Amino acid sequence: MMYGEEKSDSLIVAANLANNPQGAESVERRSGAKGNAEQPHMRRTQSRESMSQRLSRVREAAKQRKKERFTALFHLLTAEALENAFLSLSRKAAAGVDGVRWKDYAENLKVNIADLHRRLHQGSYRAQPGRWHYIPKADGKQRPLGIASLEDKIVQYALVKILNAVYENDFMGFSYGFRPGRSQHNALDALATGLVRTNVNWVLDADISQFFDKVSHEWLIRFIEHRIGDQRVIRLIRKWLTAGTSEEGEWRASEEGTPQGAVISPLLANIYLHYVFDLWAHQWRRRHATGNVVMVRYADDIVIGFDKRIDAQCFRIAMQRRLKEFGLTVHPKKTRLTEFGRFAAENRASRGKGKPETFNFLGFTHISGKDRSGRFMLIRKTRRDRMTATLKAIKDGLRKRWHYSIPEQGKWLRRVVQGYLNYHSVPGNYPMMRKFRIYVTDLWRRALRRRSQQDDTTWTKANRLAAVWLPKVRVLHPWPVERFTARHPRQEPGA
């Protein structure tokens, strides 16, 4: 199950994830623990403090007192925090079961926020089920998408800001998914740096099967209570977990899993995997590994690099056993142990094997290669299946815009292609991006020819149109080692 925003063209308009100038907050590499201390109460001073000042105090308390359970956080869900959350939401998102859109709520914002704040603090706020919707997947299947109601989004966004002040001090350095100041490219940089700088010969690419649908509510709440002792916050999270979904007026209960795609879902997922995987994996590496181990996790997608094959095999068995204790399993087809690294080609050749194996992570195929001087070089190329799916989505998009003028089609294609290039234009991937632009040009040429049998759109004319409307291909990201070192001069990759 997913909660999301039901935006059109979501398959083909990639987010702008080029150089992120913000540094990630520091993290503590330690296990979470219960405590019974109560942080200083802030109600007397909150009227004279901004929301950022209050969160800074929570952040500092979480950093200084590692075992503290925060018992007074709910009062930080102020009218100011709720209004700021509302203003941060997408204005074009689809409505949930309540039928309320952003612009509708904004017409009487102060009154609506005051009423929501009153219901929250009087205990009469009720979470709404997600409105069930289906979106196509790259493999042709459909993925269920739950559209949350607007007020649920508002409260979740405000609470996530508060809880992040606590948990960003706890999460491990190798955890990258959906965290403030961290992006997919930061995870890719960390992995690339670890593979290049560290002696890695084996890569375990692990995917947790149906993770968001299999999260145990009981275990999740127990994990949250390691740090959060405010029962009003706990009750609020329980409401969202059990709100269920609604499809064509029929309500469905949710006895397990998190509302994937909801504003709060990524944080809940990170909390769950922090206790189930991150702390355990870090401890296993320190106690049992006989060689180098590099780890990077982005949500439920995990890549671990090993120096020795025996470590990789032992870790895989131990990981499967660990996940099973908490109701999770690894996907049998998407989890692979790959021979990889600077010695992979030589070692495989000595055994009569073929070229070194590859693995996929966050949209890129990672390849063991060599530079012109014969030294090991990590090559990253856009996954062919993902590019094929994107081109198909562009073809469908052009079909929907059949009768648009050429400038209207050109503006749409420019936005789509630029979004794709923003993510995929990394060093070494220029040839794939050039092919992508050529394929898009050809799709546009064919679309123009089909809409009129008398259209004489030749390759020459199509290339002229592409020169006007489509962005030129160029490398938009620095080398991963350079960017990782600039962001984390003292941190080891995959630490």
Where on the chain are the PLM-derived regions?
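Non-catalytic terminal/accessory segments
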Residues: 1-495
